């Protein structure tokens, strides 16, 4: 469960290491984001020669949360940390690699590219 001011790890090779959520997209009263939701983030920690710089603002999709996601069969998939993948204005991933597992909930038309790049889909 991600809200404004939440810090997330970055699960791609854009050069960003940590981002902070500045807005949950999808309605003016929307407070929380879960796996598969798009958020607006700012880069807080970046690698020296990365594609992105500290202070820049991007869209991102949440790929892992410590809160987890409940499946239809009653199982719960959760992770040790919160992570996101940075997106451009067209909601396409900026990076060319994804690190760590992602969930099946991302298998929508919008995020199939992320699922195909991920090393493991849970």
From Swiss-Prot:
One cellular-component annotation, GO: cytosolic large ribosomal subunit
Keywords in alphabetical order: Ribonucleoprotein, Ribosomal protein, RNA-binding, rRNA-binding
Classification via SMART domains: Ribosomal_L14 (SM01374)
Encoding gene per record: rplN
Gene Ontology terms describing biological process: translation
Domain of life: Bacteria
Protein task: Binds to 23S rRNA. Forms part of two intersubunit bridges in the 70S ribosome.
Family: Belongs to the universal ribosomal protein uL14 family.
Gene Ontology MF terms: large ribosomal subunit rRNA binding; structural constituent of ribosome
InterPro entries per the UniProt record, alphabetical: Ribosomal_uL14, Ribosomal_uL14_bac-type, Ribosomal_uL14_CS, Ribosomal_uL14_sf
Subunit structure of this chain's protein: Part of the 50S ribosomal subunit. Forms a cluster with proteins L3 and L19. In the 70S ribosome, L14 and L19 interact and together make contacts with the 16S rRNA in bridges B5 and B8.
Protein name per UniProt: Large ribosomal subunit protein uL14
PANTHER family xrefs: 50S/60S RIBOSOMAL PROTEIN L14/L23 (PTHR11761), LARGE RIBOSOMAL SUBUNIT PROTEIN UL14M (PTHR11761:SF3)
